[in-house]
């Protein structure tokens, strides 16, 4: 189950959204919103209020002359005062 969550995305926009209890992750592209919500609630013992997903389109890399595969990004809204702790 942990291998379905790939890593947390840390950009300027995602760091600013941490103040409003929104976390951004890259997840496996086969997961749907209900599965993502269940995984995060079980792994981190938090209440997920909202799940927003976004699939990035595959893009052409001019350096390697091939397409990069698409990925799925998820933005989770959790209860205020709760934190996702990474060990």
Curated annotation (Swiss-Prot):
Q: Which GO terms describe its molecular function?
A: rRNA binding; structural constituent of ribosome
Q: What does this protein do?
A: Binds to 23S rRNA.
- Recite the UniProt keywords alphabetically: Chloroplast, Plastid, Ribonucleoprotein, Ribosomal protein, RNA-binding, rRNA-binding
Record carries keyword RNA-binding:
yes
The gene that this protein is the product of is rpl23
Q: Does the keyword Ribosomal protein apply?
A: yes
Family as reported in the entry's similarity comment? Belongs to the universal ribosomal protein uL23 family.
Q: Name one Pfam family in it.
A: Ribosomal_L23
InterPro entries, sorted? Nucleotide-bd_a/b_plait_sf, Ribosomal_uL23-like, Ribosomal_uL23/eL15/eS24_sf
Its primary localisation, in coarse terms, equals plastid
**Record's protein name:** Large ribosomal subunit protein uL23c
May I have one GO cellular component term? ribosome
PANTHER family the record matches? 60S RIBOSOMAL PROTEIN L23A (PTHR11620)
Subunit note:
Part of the 50S ribosomal subunit.
According to its UniProt entry, the protein's GO biological process terms are:
translation
Q: Which Gene3D superfamilies does this entry report, sorted A to Z? A: 3.30.70.330
Localization recorded for this chain is: Plastid, Chloroplast
């Amino acid at each position: 189950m942990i291998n379905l969550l790939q890593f947390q995305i840390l950009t300027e926009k995602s760091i600013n959204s941490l103040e409003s209890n929104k976390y951004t992750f890259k997840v496996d592209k086969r997961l749907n919103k209900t599965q993502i919500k269940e995984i995060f609630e079980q792994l981190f013992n938090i209440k997920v209020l909202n799940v927003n997903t976004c699939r990035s389109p595959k893009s052409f890399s001019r350096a390697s002359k091939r397409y990069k595969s698409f990925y799925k990004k998820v933005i989770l809204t959790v209860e205020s005062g709760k934190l996702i702790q990474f060990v």
